[in-house]
């Protein structure tokens, strides 16, 4: 990028950071070169308001083909009857659902943010918590898992118009069939936000919400390993028509066809047999990481994981998430502080550290390597003031990064 050396330098610095750090943020992954090539294509030049073959601009014959291919691949990948690939993000996808199915003042019920939910599921700082009445369900205090009987009771008490089942920090499987039963009992719509587990659902390694939910939203990165973006799915074409209008002109203008092309590439990659093998490794690697940390005396929320998320409860070692986040950052491990169920600390401090296995699995990290990662993290957290251990940890991180390079060729 000779025309802008300042930006070129920052991009190269970011590439170097990704190559030399262990990426354990659960919401991040590494897109393939093919996905990035599509996103960096000339499709970025084309405005295409509307849907394929129903545009407000001329010259859309080729972007129509791109978007229709993305739609068809998404439907086939998830077994849906309808799909909209235009949402710019998962939050935009959720907002489109709210606009199409709800009126301001209606009640929505989602998982409490501090228990693993998401901002867009009714948090008071988000538009979902400002435009709608909200109520939230929590995990059981003893098991730290969803208690469907308690959720049913909460739904009956509050009579929500929409129930959301989904999370940003819940490491266990979701019983979509049980949620459907509750939604039917209170005559509510059911929305599944599978942003974190979409790749596992696509691989058949997590139960699919499509047969049970009125609408399904997701991001296209995370475990799906595509570009940053959103996606809406449904088994109901009539609801789909409402959702199309809610996306455009309801909440967005022109779609990002270069990103949609990258989504199409990612959907094709996710339909390959190799992707299921990858997803199996994502889960097995997360289990190894969880088990290793527990062996070292660090508590894990719900005592394990069924997906890519490993949530550390640092109260077990007398540490806050804020401190732990900085400690692992100092040895080139990227994670994020996170609330845990019934957390006494503020969201700016927290008692937890959230880890995810998807990105390092993309790099080729195997179970042995994830065991090593668990030991490096434990060494650092259990010996925060030991400079010798800190130095050894940095060296081990460097060794692992060299053993499992991010990209095998220049990008």
UniProtKB/Swiss-Prot annotation:
Q: Quickly give the catalysed reaction.
A: (6R)-5,10-methylene-5,6,7,8-tetrahydrofolate + glycine + H2O = (6S)-5,6,7,8-tetrahydrofolate + L-serine
Residues annotated for (6S)-5,6,7,8-tetrahydrofolate binding in this entry: 113, 117-119, 346-348
Compartments (UniProt record): Cytoplasm
Q: Which UniProt keywords apply?
A: Amino-acid biosynthesis, Cytoplasm, One-carbon metabolism, Pyridoxal phosphate, Transferase
Identify the pathway. Answer: One-carbon metabolism; tetrahydrofolate interconversion; Amino-acid biosynthesis; glycine biosynthesis; glycine from L-serine: step 1/1
Q: Which family does it belong to?
A: Belongs to the SHMT family.
Q: How does it assemble?
A: Homodimer.
Q: What is this protein called?
A: Serine hydroxymethyltransferase
Q: What is the lineage of its organism?
A: Bacteria, Bacillati, Cyanobacteriota, Cyanophyceae, Synechococcales
């Amino acid at each position: 990028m000779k025309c802008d050396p300042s930006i070129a330098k920052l991009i190269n610095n970011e590439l170097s950071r990704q190559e030399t750090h262990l990426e354990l943020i659960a919401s991040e992954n590494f897109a393939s070169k093919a996905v990035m090539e599509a996103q960096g294509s000339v499709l970025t030049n084309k405005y295409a308001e509307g849907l394929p073959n129903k545009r407000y601009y001329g010259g859309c014959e080729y972007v129509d083909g791109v978007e229709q291919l993305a739609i068809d691949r998404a439907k086939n990948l998830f077994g849906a009857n309808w799909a909209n690939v235009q949402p710019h993000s998962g939050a935009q996808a959720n907002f489109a659902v709210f606009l199409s199915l709800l009126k301001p003042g209606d009640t929505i019920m989602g998982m409490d943010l501090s228990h693993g939910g998401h901002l867009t599921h009714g948090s008071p700082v988000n538009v979902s918590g400002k435009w709608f009445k909200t109520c939230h369900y929590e995990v059981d205090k003893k098991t730290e898992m969803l208690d469907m009987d308690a959720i049913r009771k909460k739904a009956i008490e509050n009579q929500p118009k929409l129930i959301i089942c989904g999370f940003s920090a819940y490491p266990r499987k979701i019983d979509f069939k049980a949620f459907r039963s509750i939604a039917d009992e209170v005559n509510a719509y059911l929305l599944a936000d599978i942003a974190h587990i979409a790749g596992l659902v696509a691989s058949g390694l997590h139960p699919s919400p499509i047969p049970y939910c009125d609408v399904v939203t997701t991001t296209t990165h995370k475990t799906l390993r595509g570009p940053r973006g959103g996606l809406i799915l449904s088994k109901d074409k009539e609801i789909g028509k409402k959702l199309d209008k809610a996306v455009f002109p309801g909440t967005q203008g022109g779609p990002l066809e270069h990103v949609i092309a990258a989504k199409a590439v990612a959907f094709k990659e996710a339909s390959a047999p190799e992707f299921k093998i990858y997803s199996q490794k994502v889960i097995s690697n997360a289990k190894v990481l969880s088990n290793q940390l527990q062996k070292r005396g660090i508590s894990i929320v719900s005592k394990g994981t069924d997906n890519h998320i490993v949530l550390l409860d640092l109260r077990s070692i007398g540490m806050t998430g804020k401190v732990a986040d900085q400690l692992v950052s100092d040895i080139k491990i990227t994670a994020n502080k996170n609330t845990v169920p019934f957390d006494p600390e503020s969201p700016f401090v927290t008692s937890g550290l959230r880890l995810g296995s998807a990105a390092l699995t993309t790099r080729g990290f195997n179970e042995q390597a994830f065991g090593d990662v668990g030991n490096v993290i434990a060494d650092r957290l259990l010996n925060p003031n030991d400079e010798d251990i800190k130095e050894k940890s940095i060296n081990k991180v460097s060794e692992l990064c060299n053993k499992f390079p991010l990209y095998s060729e220049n990008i």
